[in-house]
Amino acid sequence: MPHVITRTVCAAGVDAVWAKLKDIESYPTYMTVVRSVEIERELSDGRRVSSWSVLLKGSVLEWREEEVVDEASRTLSFAQLDGDMDVFTGQWRVTAESGGTVITMEATFDIGIPLLAEMLNPVAEKALRDSCVQIASAVGAQAHA
């Protein structure tokens, strides 16, 4: 399965970036790639279920995911429950480094079309990488505003 890792450095402070990153329902107000996000259920142990609709390379991609928000490590882990891909799991992480605040995203996915995987996986991998960089850059810019 393809695995994507992105690393985006931003000028805003780590706490401000973390606050913006986990505020997923605000994404559509300042990101053109995110059409809608809704937190369906929030549990007291840091888990929540959300539904997403995003534009990926001109196509609409929709899914529901379970997320684990870990305040101590500033990580937001996710695993698709159902949706357009067979597998979509990963993690966003916010860290303070000497060059600024770093937003790292790692994801593994399977588009679920074995016969076309060789042709589609590289395209999907690039589209996912580009979208994640756009999201991280927008989060960093909003946190810095």
Regions found by a protein language model. Give the residues of each.
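Hydrophobic ligand-binding cavity/cleft-lining segments
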Residues: 1-45, 99, 145
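Hydrophobic-ligand binding "helix-grip"
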Residues: 28-29, 36, 41-43, 55-102, ...
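Residue-level detector of alpha-helix boundaries and kinks
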Residues: 2, 12, 52, 79, ...
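Generic recognition of short, well-ordered alpha-helical segments
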Residues: 22, 89, 115-119
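Short Pro/Gly-enriched beta-strand edge/turn motifs at strand-loop
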Residues: 18-21, 47-50, 72-78
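A short acidic/glycine-rich loop-to-helix N-cap element
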Residues: 108-131
